[in-house]
Amino acid sequence: MLAPRPLDLRAPRDINLWRTPLALSLGAIVLFGVTMIPDVLDKYAIIHIPSWLTMGSIDDARAILSATMGAVATVLALIFSVALLVLSMVATLFGPRLLYRFMQDRVTQRTVGLFMGTFIYIGLCFLVTHEDPESRFVPQISLITSWILVIASFASLVYYSHRIATSIQNPDMIARIARDIYPAVVRSHARTSVEGEGALPDDAAVLARAATGAIVACPTSGYLQHFDHAALVAAARDQSAMIVLRFRPGQFVLRGEPLASIVPASAASVLEKQVDRCVAFGDHRTLVQDSEFGIAQIVEIAIRALSPAVNDTFTGVACVDWLADALLALAENPPLEGNWYDASGVLRVWTPAVRLERLVKLAFDQIRQASTTTPAVLIRQLDAIRRLSARMSPAARMALRDQAEAIRECAAAGAVALDRRDLDAAFERARAELDALAAAA
């Protein structure tokens, strides 16, 4: 039986800035070949192009094409300059790890590609426009098409300018990252990826059973970006085995480290190759199945904003707001356990669980530590704790309580009396909500 083909779980982003422009440039060459067909047929009087579709004499056509090529080339250089300037600003304001969000932007790629394709198309039109008496030729349909491409290119330039102006704003960037976190969880834990469901296993029992299995060593060093759990479940089911992955997406794995255990060991000869096929590594983390990475990105923006060199309290507050939204999305998506079952409810694939309390700690710790002299951010964190507590699990509420206590200690250490009163009031509101929920449980 053929091994199941892994799903395409590549990161939903293309950080190759050249791929789309290259495709559109090749498309422009193909389009030129298509539009030349009626022009050649008209030249040999096989068909007749109406006079209202013509664009004047050969001299007029060459002059128009030459001027248009120069304008398109100038704008293309301007687009590249703006793109490089934006990348420089992003690296400074948000951090170099967020550069890929601008490199992946489809609007930038398509705008560059459209201008490159238009430039190539006009250049080809210019080459075939002959003024020799023996080979006079004006590709009228191609000339009209070139003008359509020019209009489309400049329309895309207007939208590109709008896109750049909005995308470099802090609130827009933070909101987009937060909204990407929930799809990452869905891709990682969606029950549509498995065929059945069983009772949650005891992690210690699973690891004890894995100790009796065969070890699959990691073939390369790098971040575990994603794995195809559906294909692994199918392969393990066919061999009546279980695959225990020792790492979850987002963790760094060293070459030669135990990546997975296969139980029973007799199935290792078949399943080892399947594990290699279905687990992807890379030089960086992605949001494909790594919800922690999205939270870490927002935290990085907040820490940069709260640094003494920037001191942007409003961005720090916005980061706290959107982190609360991200935690809410994670809390409302229950299957955070890394367990995948076959149709009979037999556990086939296990990975370390993503605990919500760990995500709470990740979302609050570093921002709290960077906000010891920024009471507004600490107050907003306490407000977020109060609003989240009713919708969190008991374990996550304990983590929220720990965060509230830590924030109060920060306030006692560094805030002035007036700010300390505001912080104490926010803390009491959060504690009252947590106490009420604990009493009702």
Locations of the language-model features?
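Alpha-helical membrane-embedding segments
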Residues: 76-92, 99, 125-139, 167-184, ...
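Transmembrane alpha-helix detector for multi-pass membrane proteins
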Residues: 24, 28-43, 56-131, 154-161, ...
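Short basic (Lys/Arg) and small-residue
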Residues: 1-12, 159-244, 248-249, 257-265, ...
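Membrane-interface segments at loop-to-transmembrane junctions
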Residues: 7-24, 52-70, 95-115, 134-146, ...
